């Protein structure tokens, strides 16, 4: 036999769960829905125990409202004063309590993911959806916002929406169809060929003929490039970049490079300096070997003939020795 309910309780804690207390407050309303503040007020008016430590049990009650499927949240209509949404019981959880008593629950009410916040019965589902649609339309009308105009093809659920005429510039059709152009506006086919870093085999003869007038010592009568002499085009003579290696370095039967290089001047014979005056050799011969740092060099120079390079350096050595003495 279920325990009889009482309208009021003393300061002791009532034997009801937070779900039972919330459901009791919602069902006591004539509209079967209440805001959160009215739920708090109903519980505190009926059960004096919850008039103390309000923050603790109100937080627990809010968690039960949010994480239990038996409660649904209904937005407030624009014509209703106040703020906050309403909380109501799910239409399918009417038999959640045994014999109408809030002390016992049959089982935890759970809504499937595919049917979340939607009633199981078709009639209740249609009524619930119509009510939600009316609330949203009235809220939009009060706020002054307009629904965006969608094309008719968007509402055709049976067919496929026709693609629009606009195509993204990076679509595959545009990439294939359009002509590749440079940033300056010229196509690749209209560009001039870029000259190679080294002359190609068919350009060596023209380069030699054009440079022959400016380089007579290289492209003279014994020029390095002869138009009558064919240049070898064997596959082994070419590098990985298509530039011939052998014609650039040495042609057949030639010892000088084909590319013009600066030619160093040949050193001419330096004329012999005039003979030293008589007093300087006399002083050098009379000086002792220990005082003359160049006595060994002087003896060597007297025993062997002087070369041109020694002739260039001997006056400086002689003058240095005279200054020391």
Swiss-Prot record:
Gene3D superfamilies registered for this protein in UniProt: Winged helix-like DNA-binding domain superfamily/Winged helix DNA-binding domain
InterPro entries, A to Z: Fork_head_dom (IPR001766), FOX_domain-containing (IPR050211), FOXB1_B2_FH (IPR047389), TF_fork_head_CS_1 (IPR018122), TF_fork_head_CS_2 (IPR030456), WH-like_DNA-bd_sf (IPR036388), WH_DNA-bd_sf (IPR036390)
GO molecular function annotations of the record: DNA-binding transcription factor activity, RNA polymerase II-specific; RNA polymerase II cis-regulatory region sequence-specific DNA binding; sequence-specific DNA binding; sequence-specific double-stranded DNA binding
Superkingdom field: Eukaryota
Compartment annotation: Nucleus
Pfam families: Forkhead (PF00250)
UniProt DNA-binding region: 12-103
Segments traversing the membrane: none
SUPFAM superfamilies: Winged helix' DNA-binding domain (SSF46785)
Disulfide bonds: none
Predominant localisation class: nucleus
Keyword tRNA-binding: no
Example of a GO cellular component annotation carried by this entry: chromatin
GO biological process, one term: negative regulation of neuron apoptotic process
Region: Disordered, residue numbers: 284-325
Residue stretches of biased makeup (Low complexity): 284-309
Keyword annotations: DNA-binding, Nucleus, Transcription, Transcription regulation
Free-text function comment from the UniProt entry: Transcription factor expressed by neural progenitor cells in specific regions of the embryonic neuroepithelium. Essential for the mammillary nuclei maintenance. Negatively regulates the proliferation of oligodendrocyte progenitors and promotes oligodendrocyte maturation. Also expressed in mammary glands, plays a role in lactation, controls development of mammary glands and the inferior colliculi of the midbrain in the central nervous system that regulates the milk-ejection reflex.
Protein name as it appears in the record: Forkhead box protein B1
Native source organism of the sequence: Homo sapiens (Human)
Gene: FOXB1
């Amino acid at each position: 036999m279920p325990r009889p309910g009482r309208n009021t309780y003393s300061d002791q804690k009532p034997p009801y769960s937070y779900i039972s207390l919330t459901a009791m407050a919602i069902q006591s309303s004539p509209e079967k829905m209440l805001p959160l503040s009215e739920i708090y007020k109903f519980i505190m008016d009926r059960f004096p125990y919850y008039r103390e430590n309000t923050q603790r049990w109100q937080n627990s009650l809010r968690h039960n409202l949010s994480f239990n499927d038996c409660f649904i949240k209904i937005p407030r209509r624009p014509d209703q004063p106040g703020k906050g949404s309403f909380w109501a019981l799910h239409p399918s959880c009417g038999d959640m309590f045994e014999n109408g008593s809030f002390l016992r629950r049959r089982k935890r009410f759970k809504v499937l993911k595919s049917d979340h916040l939607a009633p199981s019965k078709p009639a209740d589902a249609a009524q619930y959806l119509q009510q939600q649609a009316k609330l949203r339309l009235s809220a939009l009308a009060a706020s002054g916002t307009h629904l965006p105009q969608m094309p008719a093809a968007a509402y055709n659920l049976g067919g496929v929406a026709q693609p629009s005429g606009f195509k993204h510039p990076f679509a595959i059709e545009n990439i294939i169809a359009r002509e590749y152009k440079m940033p300056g506006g010229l196509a690749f086919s209209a560009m001039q060929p870029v000259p190679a870093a080294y002359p190609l085999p068919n350009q060596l003869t023209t380069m030699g003929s054009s440079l022959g007038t400016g380089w007579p010592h290289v492209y003279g009568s014994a020029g390095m490039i002869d138009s009558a002499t064919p240049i070898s085009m064997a596959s082994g003579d070419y590098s990985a970049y298509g530039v011939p290696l052998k014609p650039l370095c040495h042609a057949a039967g030639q010892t000088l490079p084909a590319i013009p290089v600066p030619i160093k001047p040949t050193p001419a014979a330096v004329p012999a300096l005039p003979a030293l005056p008589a007093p300087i050799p006399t002083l050098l011969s009379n000086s002792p070997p220990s005082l003359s740092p160049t006595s060994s060099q002087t003896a060597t120079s007297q025993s062997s003939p002087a070369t041109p390079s020694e002739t260039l350096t001997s006056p400086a050595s002689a003058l240095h020795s005279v200054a020391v003495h």
